[in-house]
Amino acid sequence: MQITADMVKKLREMTGAGVMECKTALTEADGDFEKAVEVLRKRGAAVAQKKAGRLTKEGIVTSYIHFNDKIGVLLELGCETDFVARMPEFKELAYNLAKHVAAMNPKYVTREDVPEEVLEKEKEIYRAQLENSNKPAAVVEKIVQGKLEKFYEEVCLYDQKYIFDDEKTVKEVVDELIGKIRENIRVTRFVRMRVGEE
């Protein structure tokens, strides 16, 4: 299929990706926009993987106060350069992530941040729940792993479904912006406060 400039322009408007990236994605997808978007998303994740080890010494701290003044969030979104820290897309992502934290109340940024003793306690609880199930040990361990995945989705920001697009996780949303701007971005930390909670 012939890839036209209008097709490339339309895909760029949809995704924000570069001209050549859009053209290549459309070529790979034989002009199918949905497939081209998927190609770009996969590439964004690949780019994010390559950039993951790079330091994020720049960034911003953003805040969100819920309309009733009962919940507030401070969130630090790190990046490699101050140029990216000033980009509207970067600031918008930081603010939306702060809103996400206010709504979903994660406890940790990534699953790697969950302390080992917390994981062991959760596994202990899951095994105790299955103690009298008469299931083989291997099956019990699979069930425990499945429950742990659910636990991560509840308490880890990056594993949660993004409230503004529940087709994606927060990590996928962050990875998409990494793929678009070609620079490492990461949520460094956040604090969520609610009136009356410690």
Curated annotation (Swiss-Prot):
Pfam families: EF_TS (PF00889)
Region feature (Involved in Mg(2+) ion dislocation from EF-Tu): 81-84
InterPro entries registered for this protein in UniProt: EF-Ts_dimer_sf (IPR036402), Transl_elong_EFTs/EF1B (IPR001816), Transl_elong_EFTs/EF1B_dimer (IPR014039), Transl_elong_Ts_CS (IPR018101), UBA-like_sf (IPR009060)
Subcellular location(s) of the protein: Cytoplasm
Family, similarity comment: Belongs to the EF-Ts family.
General function of this protein: Associates with the EF-Tu.GDP complex and induces the exchange of GDP to GTP. It remains bound to the aminoacyl-tRNA.EF-Tu.GTP complex up to the GTP hydrolysis stage on the ribosome.
Protein name: Elongation factor Ts
